[in-house]
């Protein structure tokens, strides 16, 4: 799916957030009111009872109870005698996620309804909606705001489109005109957020779910879903899916039903929860239910509802290595363990994939960054890398021989930017090689000497960060036996 296109949408079961999509495509205000009906304001106690009764948890990945956030802001406003600000986090910095873009482009009024409910209950001064610059959905959101009257002034703020854009503290910093990175120390936005005021900050889908429940009431809302996770879930299914889509399904539904809907073929593993998520095996996927509890039971995580299955023709560790390199580059660069440790972790994963280092090097590098940053970025990256080497242990064994797994890296993880358009691999003219061994000294991370003193290296493409060293090794070969060739 291109990042400039409106994603396809599918539904398993009763549509709620996606109701009316089939009939109207995008719901303008008239269509929105026809499909969802009217909605009235709520006093603080009413909104708290609703949020608690529906057991609403944040849909941005962390799953923090919305009622606790709301109560914290109410108490902070009273304690400090300050007005509140409501912030909608629609930045969706995770490249593999599309659910917020769907809501922005197809159902913007649901998001605005939820934000308006919160603003009225808090007697807020303003609503701020954070979106990524150049993001799909901004125009739709602006059109929706022009169609209606909000209870308080409402503005849209664009922030840099980066992975860490969705971190709450980074968004507040960006809105306040500061560098759009997480604060160096933990801060509670409920005490001091936008303009130093108590701030209610939650994800776009969270506000949309609140708007749905306000019309249904907590009991009817809970008619779908599980006892501890009522309602529906928005998922983004990509990867090997023949029909990639954003899917709305009932919480607790078998994962297999969602995979079948998106025509997912046989897989080696499935990434659950996105780039800060975890991989699960095909066997685990057959038993999994789509809920936080259900996925945790099989070793996965729901996160922001991202599902990336990998087909059997794809090198899973090569795909994972690309993601870890991307995440290392997305560091805010303000915390030493993250700034220095994540590139080390990416290097360790690359070396393990190349067969140059054992998996213990990855585990050690991950251990150096876990719990050592101002935000959860290093922890999430470490979790992703460790999960990959655990679930794809057999592939790792094949890579450890230096011969690789025999499958290609296809770039199916949804990473932004163009893939490597000129992948290159090393080749050797055995009739020329005299075993001088200079090449192994130039780029020891990729070339080693076998028992007879001749060079040995993986048949896989040379990692981009080793490309310069490989080229130097080619140049110093006295017999002109070593060459760089296009990798097919």
Description of each model-found segment:
Residues 37-50, 82-84, 90, 100-104, ...:
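Ferredoxin-type iron-sulfur electron-transfer modules in oxidoreductases and energy-metabolism complexes
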Residues 52-73, 162-173, 328-340, 373-385:
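Conserved phosphate/anionic-ligand binding catalytic regions in large, soluble enzymes, centered on
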Residues 107-121:
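Histidine-anchored nucleotide/phosphate-binding helix
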Residues 82, 133-251, 262-264:
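Hydrophobic alpha-helical positions that pack around
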Residues 2-48:
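Cofactor-/ligand-binding subdomain signature composed of acidic, glycine-rich
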Residues 337-343, 379-380, 434, 438-454, ...:
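Iron-sulfur cluster-binding cysteine motifs and their immediate structural context
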Residues 29-33, 88-100, 192, 236-241:
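Gly-rich Lys/Arg/Thr-decorated short loops/hinges at beta-loop-alpha junctions or inter-strand turns
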């Amino acid at each position: 799916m291109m990042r400039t296109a409106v994603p396809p949408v599918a539904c398993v079961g009763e549509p709620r957030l996606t109701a009316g999509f089939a009939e109207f495509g995008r719901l303008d205000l008239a269509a929105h009111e026809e499909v969802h009906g009217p909605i009235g304001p709520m006093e603080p106690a009413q909104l708290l009872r609703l949020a608690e009764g529906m057991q609403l948890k944040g849909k941005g990945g962390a799953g923090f109870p919305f009622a606790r956030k709301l109560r914290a802001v109410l108490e902070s406003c009273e304690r400090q005698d300050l007005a509140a600000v409501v912030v909608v986090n629609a930045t969706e910095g995770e490249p593999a996620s599309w659910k917020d873009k769907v809501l922005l482009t197809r159902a913007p009024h649901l998001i605005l309804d939820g934000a308006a409910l919160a603003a009225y209950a808090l007697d807020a001064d303003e609503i701020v909606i954070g979106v990524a610059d150049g993001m799909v959905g901004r125009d739709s959101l602006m059109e929706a705001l022009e169609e209606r009257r909000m209870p308080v002034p409402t503005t849209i703020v664009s922030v840099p489109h980066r992975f860490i854009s969705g971190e709450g503290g980074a968004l507040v910093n960006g809105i306040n005109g500061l560098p759009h990175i997480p604060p160096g120390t933990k801060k509670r936005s409920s005490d001091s957020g936008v303009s130093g005021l108590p701030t209610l900050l939650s994800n776009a889908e969270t506000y949309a779910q609140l708007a749905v429940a306000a019309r249904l009431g907590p009991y009817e809302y809970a008619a779908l879903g599980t006892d501890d996770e009522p309602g529906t879930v928005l998922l983004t299914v990509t990867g090997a899916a023949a029909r990639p889509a954003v899917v709305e399904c009932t919480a607790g539904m078998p994962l297999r039903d969602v995979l079948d809907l998106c025509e997912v073929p046989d897989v080696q593993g499935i990434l659950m929860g996105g780039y800060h998520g975890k991989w699960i095996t095909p066997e685990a996927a057959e038993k999994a239910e789509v809920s936080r509890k259900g996925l945790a039971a099989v070793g996965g995580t729901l996160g922001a509802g991202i599902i990336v299955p990998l087909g059997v023709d794809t090198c899973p560790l090569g795909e994972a290595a690309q993601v870890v390199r991307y995440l290392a580059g997305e560091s805010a660069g303000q915390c030493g363990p993250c700034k220095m440790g994540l590139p080390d972790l990416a290097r360790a994963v690359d070396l393990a994939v190349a067969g140059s280092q054992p998996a213990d090097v990855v585990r050690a590098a991950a251990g150096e960054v876990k719990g050592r940053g101002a935000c959860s970025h290093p922890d999430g990256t470490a979790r992703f890398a460790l999960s990959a080497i655990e679930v794809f242990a057999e592939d790792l064994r094949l890579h450890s021989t230096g011969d690789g797994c025999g499958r290609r890296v296809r770039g199916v993880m949804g990473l932004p930017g163009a893939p490597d358009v000129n992948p290159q691999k090393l080749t050797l003219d055995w009739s020329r090689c005299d075993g001088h061994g200079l090449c192994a000294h130039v780029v020891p991370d990729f070339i080693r000497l076998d028992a007879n003193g001749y060079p040995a290296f993986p048949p896989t493409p040379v990692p981009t960060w080793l490309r310069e060293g490989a080229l130097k090794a080619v140049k110093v070969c006295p017999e002109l036996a070593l060459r760089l060739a296009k990798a097919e």
